Regions:
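C-terminal charged capping/lid subdomain of soluble metabolic enzymes
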Residues: 2-17, 309-452
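Solvent-exposed alpha-helices and their adjacent loops that cap or buttress functional pockets
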Residues: 22-23, 47, 102-105, 126, ...
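Generic secondary-structure signature for well-ordered alpha-helical cores
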Residues: 73-77, 101-104, 157, 168, ...
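A glycine/threonine-rich phosphate-anchoring loop and its flanking beta-alpha core
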Residues: 128-226
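Active-site segments that bind and position negatively charged phosphate/pyrophosphate groups
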Residues: 219-370, 375-385
């Protein structure tokens, strides 16, 4: 039996941490249990709201929204609703605009009935409107329920906008357990991605001095451990296992809200996912669930970390390497296409690839290399273990299974780091001149696996 999470330990108060910062979240209520839908009216009233605005899509309304509305009717709570008709919802300007236009100004709180995309849309729109929002979760598919950021696609670029956390997360375990298994395995993939993102965060702390909190890292590790332990029961849709996994996803989100950004839960594995998502959207392809892509990205990043452990560097020679900005810019334009201006603007601002900055990082990398090797060994399970775990649950473990070609794998490894100003393994590989080589290696690795 997995260790139980008591999420109430993190709610309603601030914590002075050994990292020197005060941690707190504005999340007030978490109710993930049997028949939680019947308690939705009570939670709305407890928070002092009179008229919620329910936001769903055709799938989540059928799965949970209609039942939630029925409970509100019985309780005598007036509400308005907006149901997206699109079967594949894209969180872009058009979708956000349609939601803002449909909003009823006599409502005093927004309730997202759904998971990832609906949560991001409601998180951002409520923040812009100066309203609070709640989540009635329909699937344990990702860990962004209570993160402070809203992931949207603007000007063709996947961008995280500062927003706020919901005041409540409600999840009925019967509804959560009945969700398509693909969405459950997506949640597992999102959580397993924490193995690599936490290592990226620690590496950034060692090499760049970026803020790092071991307490928050331990919170995320606890979430990962629970999901791994529950993975055998989750395949059978065991309600207790679904509850544990959903609470682990919420815990990961609380960790993000403590930091104020997604650093404890998003690293190079997410950047690969973002790149594939942007390419799929540009080409008009059906979106792949976020956590499914993250799980595959995690395998790729773990494999690259394993390979990095065996490298030996001539740091003096590395510092002499030049950077062909024109070639980089051409590659960005060729691959990112309509999103390229935003990517180039980010580099002009962040200067991630500035040679003076690179050489300062290389000097620290040389000095800290033994510590970095120890950190890698202590932090990661093997890529083979992760492949077996995901495969046992029926989750994709190879990019080819989700329609990502070898070329797209290679391009993602080379260019995904440009999506964010965030130091990860991909920047280490660029700094050390290994990025193109590792891109080919990972593409070949998955290509061979796909042909077996």
């Amino acid at each position: 039996m997995a260790k139980k999470i008591n999420l109430n330990d993190y709610l309603g108060h601030s914590m002075d941490c050994t990292c020197g910062k005060e941690h707190k979240t504005n999340l007030k209520i978490v109710d993930i249990d049997k028949d939680a839908v019947s308690r939705l009216p009570k939670h709305i009233e407890a928070l002092g709201y009179k008229k919620p605005f329910l936001v769903a899509d055709v799938n989540t309304w059928a799965a949970a929204g209609a039942l939630a509305a029925e409970k509100l009717d019985v309780a005598g709570i007036s509400y308005k609703k907006y149901i997206f008709n699109e079967k594949e919802l894209i969180p872009d300007e058009k979708t956000l605009g349609s939601l803002m236009m449909a909003f009823s100004r006599d409502c005093d709180v927004i309730v997202a009935v759904g998971s990832g995309t609906l949560n991001d849309l409601c998180k951002f729109s409520s923040f812009q409107l100066g309203l609070d929002y709640m989540v009635f979760a329909t699937a344990p598919s990702m860990d962004g329920f209570v993160s402070i950021g809203a992931a949207l696609i603007t000007n063709y670029v996947k961008t995280t906008y500062q927003a706020h956390v919901p005041l409540a997360v409600i999840g009925d375990t019967d509804i959560l357990a009945a969700t398509p298994m693909e969405m459950i395995t997506a949640g597992l993939g999102d959580i397993l991605g924490k193995y690599t993102c936490l290592l990226d965060w620690k590496m950034a702390h060692i090499i760049t001095g970026e803020y790092y909190c071991s307490h928050i890292a331990d919170m995320v590790k606890e979430a990962v451990e629970i999901v791994v332990e529950e993975s055998t029961r989750i395949k059978d849709r065991n309600p207790d296992a679904v509850k544990a996994v959903t609470e682990a996803l919420v815990l990961s989100g609380i960790a993000m809200s403590f930091v104020g950004n997604s650093r404890p839960a998003s690293g190079s594995e997410h950047h690969l996912s973002h790149y594939w998502e942007m390419k799929f959207q540009a080409e008009g392809k059906k979106p792949i669930l976020h956590g499914i892509k993250v799980g595959i990205g995690m395998i790729a990043v773990t494999k690259m970390y394993e390979t990095l452990e065996n490298e030996q560097f001539d740091f003096a020679s590395l510092k002499e390497r030049s950077f062909d900005y024109a070639a980089w810019e051409k590659k960005v334009k060729d691959c990112y296409q309509d999103a390229a201006p935003g990517i180039i603007a980010l580099e002009e601002k962040a200067q991630k690839n500035n040679l003076d900055k690179r050489n300062k990082r290389l000097a620290i990398l040389e000095k800290k290399w033994p510590e970095i090797l120890r950190t890698i060994k202590e932090s990661l399970p093997s890529s083979a273990e992760m492949e077996k775990l995901l495969a046992r649950l029926g989750a994709p473990i190879n990019p080819a299974q989700i329609g990502v070609s070898s070329e797209l794998v290679e391009d993602a490894v080379i260019l995904a780091k440009e999506v964010r100003d965030r130091f990860t393994l991909l920047q280490v590989l660029w700094d050390t001149g290994l990025l193109d080589e590792y891109a080919k290696m990972i593409a070949a690795y998955f290509g061979e696996k796909a042909n077996c």
